Amino acid sequence: MPPRFFAVLTAAFFTACACCLGKPTLFIIGDSTVRNSTPGQMGWGDPLVAHFDPSKIEVINRAIGGRSSRTFLTEGRWDAVIAHLKPGDFVLIQFGHNDGGELNDGRCRASLRGNGDGTEIITRKTDGKSETVMSFGAYLRKYIRDAKSKGATPIIVSLIPRNIWKDGRIGRSGDGHGLWAKQAAEQENACFIDFNQILAGRYESLGPEKTAGLFAGSDHTHTSAAGAEFNAGVMANAIRGLKDCDLAKGLLPGDLWLPGIFSDHMVLQRGMPVPVWGTATAGERVTVKLAGQSVAVNAAEDGRWRVDLPPLADAGPFTLEVSTPGASRAFADVLVGEVWLCSGQSNMDFTLASTAKRSFSGVTDWKNEVAAARQPMLRMFTAEWTMREHPQREVAGKWAVCDPENAADFSAVAYYFGREIQQAVGVPVGLITCAFGASTIEAWIREPTLTKHPQFEGLLKEFGRKRIAFRDDPQAFASYGAALAKWKSGRVPRNPDPVQDQHNPFVLHNGMIAPIVPYALRGAIWYQGESNLNTRGIYPDLQKALIEDWRDLWGNPTLPFYYVQLAAYKAPSKDPAPGGQIAEMREAQAASLAIPHTGMAVTIDIGDEKDIHPRNKKAVGLRLARLALTGTYGRPGVPCGPVFQSASVAGNSIRIRFDHVNGGLVSAAGPLCGFAIADHDKRFVSAQAAIEGNEVVVSSPEVAAPAFVRYAWADNPAGANLRNADCLPAAPFRTDP
């Protein structure tokens, strides 16, 4: 199967939608104060997403800069939203900044002043077409009626105030668009948030100097990222105050909240400070208690708080208690031991049991494996598939104890890895699985980290182009909504939103990694690469960036990072060293061995020529565990199979030396195979290979003056059988540039 086709196929399987998950959706529509793509500016709609619980509601921000209540309708953008609306959904509607001015100027976006039913017919200067222009209030009333006709709840929001002060007060719109928005909501019996008045009061309490810091430079209309965050927090509180509206049920708690990574049955990392964080009412005292320790802190102005519990020894079970004067949370059956992040694409997401929850699942002999999975000291947190444009506070998921019922849905690689660590080290083990089928590595890296590297500029520019194209094409969103409405079973219609595409930069970091940072952990294991075959040339830089990014996020420059080199795939070739995309990707992956505190599990011997998802996940997990036990826990033994160290030409042969020999080299079965040599013309032929102590000597009567050697240099290097004394396979390599 061609790699790109594989990626598209799996994306179709893995792309989730709010409709099929049965959750309500909040749609946000408005102008640039709600969503802004101008550098240095941000609208409140994007950070508002992080205030909602992703397990309860989906949030889609369809606001776009430069639009008014009139043009959002005439450009077909509202029709695109309507195509998605279903009973139980919500729509937040904020316009007004662009509704003033001349009706028929170069933008043709102004609406008639007021809330009346009067209209004016114009011939637009922009395209010569006739248009009947309504009042600002009439457009809002249409949005309200249309939303209600679909069973959704519309919420009208008055426009945010501009940063213009007079006599110590900030300007309001109580007799203009703010008033007309309120009147329209009242006429149609819709919910109304007087955001203009609420924010004006909050800005005045801050004063002109601090308020200026919430806006983008000298711009008095558009907020900075800090201002957008501030406004989003105010909006979340305003939503909580709505009467006869269930939208607040989808919000994260406003009094005392901790992210879902904190739940019953969690495992906390031993031997290092343990961060515990969340939100509470600004200024409130938050007290955290665990194992006889108590740490307190005051919530910041934005409600956020964090404490770092002193290092703990492995023990438990405990109860973690978090309280404020007005609220408390308690988490039971908390263990202290070793915590590992387990991430990557479908081979990491591949579950122990064959299950309908995953398209690729079920290890060899999975029924017996699941039945035997009784490991109460092993727990797993599985993050739900989530992609976002901006970093989130929460990802859906919960900790589960390893028993036959829960283990069926465990990542198989993570399970075998964790089981081996638990049995060898003898302490509780917690596994945090953040994996997404068909994902690229750049999807897991922070945007600021990617931006620092010029070699990733093309990836970021292309993603930016896709986002702009999708933003400017309401028909694509409308067509997707129509397809969802018709969908009953089978493959879910593909979401055209590039933010909901796991091939694009930073979207999985924002949705799945950001919410669990800075949960204390020992290290990370990684199984990914298939979806980056087309960018294998920059993969060494990408994997290095990922490692550096995670080490920076967790404040640990030596955070262990152990990863899987791609398994054998596709039909074996008769060519002695055919190469191929997968062979080159393995070379790209191996480059990370130069980074300290890393290790690579070689899997060329356990692949499946017909399936990129080999079912022998036990060997993969055990090899990763071996890397961790020797590299992180100091256990004796060799971490992996032989890894190329150097080669030297001696007459008509080449002598090859390896690291991680561990008492000698062996051939797994029969004569040593898999080597090819060539002179400077690089016409490789099969080589005769012989083990001499800890070295391999290769030659061929066809090559009198050998210059280069390759080993297992194929997508499926069938027959390559060099091992060390522990029967661990040697890593593929080539010496030709």
Where are these regions (language model features)?
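Positively charged n-region of N-terminal signal peptides that target proteins for export
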Residues: 1-5
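Low-complexity, Gly/Ser/Thr/Pro-rich intrinsically disordered linker/tail segments
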Residues: 223-252
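Short, electropositive alpha-helical surface patch
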Residues: 154, 161-162, 167-180, 209-218, ...
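Conserved, well-structured core segments that form or line functional sites
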Residues: 137, 141-162, 166-168, 175, ...
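C-terminal/domain-terminus segments
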Residues: 159, 167-170, 175, 241-252
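Cell-envelope and extracellular/periplasmic
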Residues: 24-35, 42, 50, 54-55, ...
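Boundary at the C-terminal end of the N-terminal hydrophobic targeting segment
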Residues: 18-24
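Bacterial N-terminal signal peptides
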Residues: 7-17
